[in-house]
Amino acid sequence: LGDQRAKLYGKIRKWGSVGFIVGVFTIGAILEIIPISMLPILLLIIASLAFIWAFTIREPEGAPTSQKHLEPLLPVLKRPEVAAFFTIEFILLFSHAPFYSFYSNFLKSLNFSTTEIGFLWAMGVVSEIVMFAYATTFFKYFSWRSLVAVCLILTSIRWLLVAIFSHYFIGQLFAQCLHAFSFGLFHLIAMRLIFQNFSIGQQGRGQAFYSTMWGLGVAFGSILAGHYWKILTGEHIFMIAALVVLFGLCFVYWLPKQIEKSVS
């Protein structure tokens, strides 16, 4: 993507989400015909095709070569804006844990049909696709600090909708549409953070660290949510998640007000 990587990232990333939806519905239809025991073989075929297709992609001009000595990440991670952002990411994903781990079972316990549950998940992905396609508009008119704050506040509202309107499909639908902000917009901001603060040789490890913080947040949150799920109710767990995510606002102050023009 070269110098346009931040600007074009969302438009390219949306196709991953499109592929997810197509894959889910296609594989679901295929499993109506073949036994589920064939699923590993089916996934292996798909992965093999993707692997073979990858060889058709040409190496871009000016692509970074391998480094003999890796540039240290610690100096970058110590920057206030970077440390604050990854802390916010952990808190955000910690609050997502009940959703990623228990949302489907939560809805099933409330007598939502499998079709309704599948539709709600699909709407979440559709909302992120829309965000990936049009997020550059937000970056033109709003500061990075403001956008992260909006992501946190709307995520809190999302979990409140899940809890308060737990028995209502329309309430869950609105909550899923907010996935555009709680995941979509925040993810794009994360990529801009990496492009802006990490050198070309560091960006792969920067994205790996981003994924690590993502996994840690969900993992720790899932452990606690799982422990208290039977002690409390699903509604109470999501209300707690709505409060927890707001702690991320304590770290927004250290984020820059603007993203450098080179990454906008």
Task: Enumerate the language-model features and the residues they cover.
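Helix-to-loop junctions at the C-terminal end of transmembrane segments
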Residues: 31-32, 131-143, 229-230
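Juxtamembrane intracellular "pre-TM" segments in multi-pass secondary transporters
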Residues: 57-89
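Helix-loop boundary and gating motifs at the non-cytosolic
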Residues: 81-120
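A membrane-interface helix-boundary motif in multi-pass transporters
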Residues: 29-45, 227-245
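Helix-loop junctions at membrane interfaces in 12-TM secondary transporters
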Residues: 163-175
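Intracellular juxtamembrane helix-capping segments at the cytosolic ends
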Residues: 1-3, 185-198
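Structural signature of the two symmetry-related core transmembrane helices
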Residues: 146-161
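Loop-to-transmembrane helix entry/capping segments in MFS-fold secondary transporters
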Residues: 3-15, 114, 198-210
